[in-house]
Amino acid sequence: MTNLYRLFVKYPDSMSKIGSLVLMGGAVNSKGNVTEHAEFNFYCDPIAADYVLSTGVPVTLVDLKACRQVGMSRKVAHSISSVTRTGQLAIELIVNWFGLDETRSVFEFYDPLALAISIDPSLATYDATDITVHTNVTPRYGETVAFYTQGSTNLVDIVDADKFFHMFADFLDIKGLLP
């Protein structure tokens, strides 16, 4: 987010050259993952997040609520396989993530979901809205707020998890993930 902010501030004309953005960040109407109210990406630089979302550049926002719809359990992670090196590496990363903390029960696909939606927008339904990010240093610092007006941000609402996991499995040639 910070890099986009810097680009737009230093080169304002660049905004007119961008058709749209797909961003992963924020926690609209859901619990944050850094604080009760804030998601990590927006918490790190809420001023940049708020600025980017207010430019008028069309944004598809994949927030935590969306990402929490595409989770993989520890059991599934240990039961899948791939014959490709890239697929094996992806599985290894997920399994190792679970190994860092025995209380972890679900791996959520944050950036992979944003990438998948940028490739195939039909993976989700959307709410067109205006969004702001709290920038004042209060307990709500970094919180993402949607106004549900006809705005330039398409907030992901419902994700087709089956379609996402089919895409994920096909892309990485993963076996044992799909029924």
Give residue ranges: language-model regions.
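Active-site histidine-anchored catalytic micro-motif
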Residues: 1-69, 74
